Amino acid sequence: MNKLYTGLALLAAVSLASCKTEGPDDGGKQIPSESTTLTLTPFEKLNASADAVNSHKDDWAQSVLTLNYRSIVNVGASVLGTDSPSYSRIVKLADGSYILTAHDFYSGGNGSTVYWATSKDLVNWTPQGKLFASRSVVNARGQEATRLYTNGFGKVLSNGDVLMFASFRTTGTYSFWKWRYEQGIEMRRSTDNGKTWSEPYEVYRGPNWEAIMLEDSAGELELYFSESRPWISGSHSGTSMVRSTDGGKTWLPGLGKEPYRVIRHTWYDAHQDKWLFTDQMPGLVILNDSKCKAGVFESAHDYPVGGSVNFSISFAWSPEDGNWNYIEGEEKDGTGLDVKTAKVGPADRKIDVWNGSAPSLLQFPSGETVVSYGQDTYQWLRIGDSRARNFGAAAKYLPAKGSWSSILLDGTHELITHMRNSTDSKNVGVTLCKLALNHRIAASSHKVVIDGNNSDWVNADDALFAGSKCQAQATLRCAADADNIYFLVECRDENVSKDDYVQVFIAPSDAAKLNAQTLRVKVGLNGLRNQGVYAGNWIEKDLGAKAVVRYDATLSDASDVDNGWLAEISVPRSSVKVVDGKVKVNLALFDMEGGEDAIVSTGEKNPQKWITVTGL
């Protein structure tokens, strides 16, 4: 039987000067147990209030991505239909379900068939078979050949239609300019969330890889891809595009015509003693509240004699009106083109920003951009500003080693990240997970009764998240009235221990280091365990804080599955230095299974790296 325990600790007011070195946790006065069922709101159901577009563009550098450990899923061969799935891509449909695509590892990972699977929750996946299946053809040379498919990519249009693309190539003709039109891109459409699909049809002809698509506010579609020139070099690329003004029914400039060339720069291949084009594997977004497009690309950097190609990450931006300046001039077979002096573009770009490959780019509605890329078999992510021009430090979250990672938005405060996981060469699959966006939140303005009942928090849904170490996870919400600042911490935990606890840290919004105005409140399953300030270390001090804890669990009993616990906390305004209606906060969850799990490491001494709470 799950039981509810309510712990209440009310510390008598004492002089702020009255403090002592922190001693053992004091615990709290026990209130008789009573049965209940707690309703704990998961992070994905919070932050539902609509913020203004780019609401956090000015403080993007304080935003933090946090792994949601519970969301980690490994999708294997039994689902994807191939023993070594590669180049995974996920698209979220209009009905809230998901499609995962991947191709097989044929020809060193270049692929022959694109497989797909569906899910309603990102956890349970249903195999759907082949979306673009390799097939026998007679090529232009009169040979028995095979049309091979690779790089599946999906996009949901504003009308709910799903467009799926795959690059194709034909054996025996791929490396020849004369037969370039036996390669290209095919598309399929679904108007019923993937239940049925149109027959594939060609939207572009010419060697290519890694197509992605954008839809602008006017409904115009732009399909970008790595344009390949294999008759010259396998490392001779650049990003080109075709476009549609009728929802993807027809594409310009038309089959058999050279594409619109939009992004490329030159590099020197010492191995072949050639100048070549680069900027491939495009990842593009239309920036919030703008028509400007920002793109990230894999760029060949150098190919030393006796070595291998080294890749880096590059960026490019369209003009503000979103219209690229096309790189004019027919190339034909390219033999008469002096690549070293050839036209490149666009003018607004950054080349060789970091070492890496296979990038992806997204933007949250609140303004933060996120770039991902691969390096040394790991996926790395960086948070950037609202123009995708400045980025913070790189961090890795996905618990996998492999290649061809990607990211996509899932709501306003989460992203999905995934990649081919080849850590175990005998069990290759796709590993995916969610990351939560922790950024500035607003306190709701209302009085909270500190009784362990979270019903008075219904209209306070700005929330922070901790939960990267194990299945135990916590959210934090804030409210305030004229007398107190309130916090609700909800902990979802399948195995609650009597020794679990949370810590809420509070600092003035202008504090650059921990000091005597930095507060900490520690709350465990028996109520308020400790409270105090920082003076070289944490000093116990009566802040007048109150806490009530309730749990829906059998404590320290692993034989069943618990729901979790919550804590309502109040801190008098008189104990908190509020600057311009703001404070800095940090949340740390200690769970016996995963240890300490904080939004920002509790070893961080600069509160400016904590999260801002406004509305105070």
Question: What feature does the model see in each segment?
Answer:
Residues 85-87, 149-151, 208-211, 279-281, ...:
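Conserved positions at the start
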Residues 440-451, 505-534, 573-616:
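Acidic/polar low-complexity flexible segments
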Residues 334-337, 495-562, 615:
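Extracellular/luminal beta-rich ligand-recognition
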Residues 27-145, 155-207, 215-273, 286-351, ...:
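Beta-rich carbohydrate-recognition and catalytic domains
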